[in-house]
Amino acid sequence: MVIPGFLATDHSTFALRSGLATSGYDVHGWGQGTNLGASEARLERLARDVALIADRREQPVMLVGWSLGGLYAREIAKRAPDHVARVVTLGSPFSGNPRSNRVWWLYEWINGHPVDALPIDCDLSAKPPVPTIALWSRDDGIVASASARGLPHEADATVELSCSHIGFTFEPAAIAAVIEALRTH
């Protein structure tokens, strides 16, 4: 399953999902329209969808989350590790100060709560109990590289790319890195 970032939809991850499908993966979008921000209801619905896919396929699901979508992926893996095989985050701000990105103010304006006081019970930097790979870029432009890379204990592996924040979803090298992370880490 590929989970889009803040203010993004499944349409924005089309190239990434197509690349994964071409590589033989059974790919699902998140199916919740525009990702407007963190909410317990949205996270619970996503967790139910992941459980349904895992039950139908009789195996855990691999989650790929771009930006805010990666935070959802990490939290679902913590809540339901039996349903998640691994997590790959793409420029997701899971480590350090939540204001270390360029759109925190927009998130707060749209959602009406501080970016460092999310309305869900979570510890963003805690590593999920499944293999967790963080893809990050010094050239991201939106999320600080340290926030998306994390500290050594916050991910099992980190992979540096050279792409913009939105480039994680369509640049061929980024798509290839996601496929590699799903296969080998």
Protein language model annotation of sequence segments:
Residues D49, I53, A177-H185:
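C-terminal alpha-helix
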Residues W30-Q32, T158-S164:
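Short glycine-rich catalytic loops that host catalytic nucleophiles or stabilize transition states
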Residues L43, F170-L182:
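Post-His helix in hydrolase/transferase enzymes
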Residues I133-G141, L161-C163:
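Conserved strand-to-loop "acid loop" that flanks and positions the catalytic carboxylate
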Residues S39, S164-P172:
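Catalytic histidine-centered segment of alpha/beta-hydrolase-like enzymes
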Residues A148-L161:
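Active-site regions of enzymes building and remodeling cell-envelope glycoconjugates
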Residues G141-S147:
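Conserved alpha/beta-hydrolase "acid-adjacent" motif
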Residues M1-H11, A15, A21-Q32, G37-V130, ...:
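Serine-dependent carboxylesterase/thioesterase catalytic core
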